[in-house]
Design a protein with these regions (language model features):
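Short aromatic-glycine-enriched beta-strand elements
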Residues: 16-21
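Domain-level recognition of nuclease-like catalytic cores that cleave nucleotide substrates
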Residues: 192-251
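Short nucleic-acid-contacting surface segments enriched for D/E, G, S/T with interspersed K/R
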Residues: 38-51
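Short alpha-helix capping/helix-loop boundary micro-motifs
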Residues: 30-40
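Active-site metal-binding core of divalent-cation-utilizing nuclease and nuclease-like domains
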Residues: 71-81, 92-149, 169-172, 227-236
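Short, charged beta-turn/beta-strand-edge "cap" motif at the junction between a beta-strand
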Residues: 13, 54-59
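Nucleic-acid nuclease catalytic cores
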Residues: 155-165, 169-204, 226
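Short, Lys/Arg- and Gly-enriched loop/turn segments at beta-strand edges
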Residues: 57-68
Length: 251
């Protein structure tokens, strides 16, 4: 995906979760929308260089959106919702390799009693009507996308960056789908150029770490994609290793 021209600025503070005060090069102080629900640990240091996109809607209350921040470890896209767009493009281009060969891709698919997957991949070779996950079958793969911005150690990214009951529930639902005969995958989309491998954030959310391990043990596929990121574009360019999927594995 490509970015329109971004405005450079200096971060003053991030607050109330969705707001960020930023100073522009001309000295103006603006309030930007911060499209990230996480803790943004290491990605919200005052004084950091940031990049903002202008709002397309002139009636929007906040005229700017915080897109990226420069950290000592690398450039980070903090607009976490863009991970879905990046992954959709990657899937269409054949990443991850083990998810190649699907006939159709559909976003935001409901399954089970009240669950929703980011994507469903249909590996059936013949069109069979609307792509609706009525019951689990191996030819229908649910895909859950998780944006990774937290770097815990040199090159090691971790998810989540705050306790997430919702993310834990997602893993349990994917595990249930697989146990019923379906196929499911979680893709960690790494939006930080300094990260070269990913692990569950055991010390932050042990419940999620355990849910991920249990899901993996029962057949949920786990992948990570690293991006090439600049102020002009962001594209998933490579698969990264996922560690910590077995007890005691944190390499």
């Amino acid at each position: 995906m490509r970015f329109d021209t971004l405005q450079q600025g200096t971060l003053i503070r991030r607050y109330k979760r969705f707001l960020a005060d930023v100073t522009l090069p001309n000295g103006d102080l603006v309030v930007a929308h911060c499209p990230n629900t996480g803790a943004m640990t290491g990605c919200a240091e005052p004084g950091s260089t940031v990049f903002l996109s202008p709002a397309n809607n002139p009636k929007r209350k906040l005229a700017w959106t915080l897109e990226m921040i420069e950290t000592p470890q690398g450039l980070v896209c903090v607009h976490s919702a863009l991970a879905n767009k990046v992954v959709a493009e990657a899937l269409e281009k054949g990443l991850p390799l083990d998810l190649q060969g699907f006939a159709r891709l559909k976003p935001e698919v409901k399954y089970g009693a009240s669950s929703r997957a980011d994507f469903m991949l249909d590996f059936r070779r013949e069109a069979v009507g609307p792509l609706i996950a009525v019951q689990p079958i191996p030819e229908l793969a649910l895909v859950e996308v998780k944006a990774v911005t937290l770097q815990q150690a040199s090159g090691l990214g971790a998810f989540p960056d705050a306790v997430s009951v919702r993310a834990t529930r997602h893993m349990e639902e994917l595990r249930g789908w697989v146990l019923q005969g379906g196929r499911a995958a979680v893709i960690f989309c790494v939006l930080h150029t300094g990260i070269n491998r990913v692990a569950p954030a055991e010390t932050i959310d042990p419940n999620y770490a355990q849910a991920l391990r249990s899901a993996f043990a029962d057949g949920v596929e786990v992948y990570a994609l690293g991006v090439d990121l600049s102020v002009d574009a962001m594209v998933a360019a490579r698969e990264l290793p996922v560690v910590g999927l077995a007890e005691g594995d944190s390499s």
